[in-house]
Amino acid sequence: MSRFILAFCSFIICLSCKNETKSIEALTAKEPTFAIVIHGGAGTILKKNITPEKEALYKAKLEEAIKVGYQILKNGGSSLDAVQKTINVLEDSPLFNAGKGAVFTNAGTNEHDASIMDGKTLNAGASAGTKTVKNPIDLARAIMEHSPHVMLSGEGAEQFATEQDLHIVDTSYFYTENRFNSLQKVKASEQVAFYDDTIKDSKFGTVGCAALDKNGNLAAGTSTGGMTNKRWGRIGDSPIIGAGTYANNNTCAISCTGWGEFFIRSVVAHDISALMEYKGLSIEEAAKEVIQNKVPALGGDGGIIGVDKHGNIAMEFNTAGMYRATMNANGDLYIGIYGE
């Protein structure tokens, strides 16, 4: 009888252990997280200088763009695809200084820069000074995946884009009256740099995206028309890996917008990642240290958007505003413009 009782007790204990194991498995087998964050430039973006109608246009385009990337991530797509397709939407809009809405150089031309980085492999691609590639972020990805190089520029980059069957357009495609008028204002004010507080809605025109997919892979990308009235083939931080764009699965994915010269000197995107990796800072702490302390100490302005490997979002800027939006795995949407 005692043997029977002992055997029965053993059976109950075993069954209990199995049920407990199943309960633990159920708890740990939750849906993988993902997140996406975008920006459309930072700068002297003041509510008093933007009409309600214009504000609505900006918010609508930010929402349209981020929902493209969100849907890709929700369906199990890669962070690279989400970043690229989201930036495509912003590049195709004349509202932002990238692609269609690119600013004018001193010579009256439009020159585009872009970069993209894969946090899983640390592969990256970038292009600078192109004039006929409709979507520079597509070129950056093609360089990353179909060339042995990281960065191509000018005519060589355009030749590669043609060989890759990317969308090539006439330079007139990039003309917008608003951007052309901005060039005339900057020239009239005798400002060499594009950051002129006396010009309404002066902003560091750049677009960017950072994303975490369900597989835990991070990616970031940035695209821009650069600086209004720029000369001599000037290139800012946007196509510079580590300065304007950086992604590493161990830490975070970052896209920057700001006064490019200072972001290059500060290696902003990589510095945030390094502070997380070597000092154990959170993405919020690292972003704040770089954007609120390090960059201003040199005299620079701007902001960043980023996401870490856990899906935590950072949107840090030291200017009056930054066009920005985020979405998480729950579908929660946030859109911001000013320093609220």
Feature annotation, model-predicted:
Residues 13-16:
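C-terminal motif of bacterial Sec signal peptides marking the signal peptidase cleavage site
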Residues 2-8:
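Sec-dependent signal peptide recognition
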Residues 18-340:
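Alpha/propeptide regions of enzymes that mature by internal proteolysis
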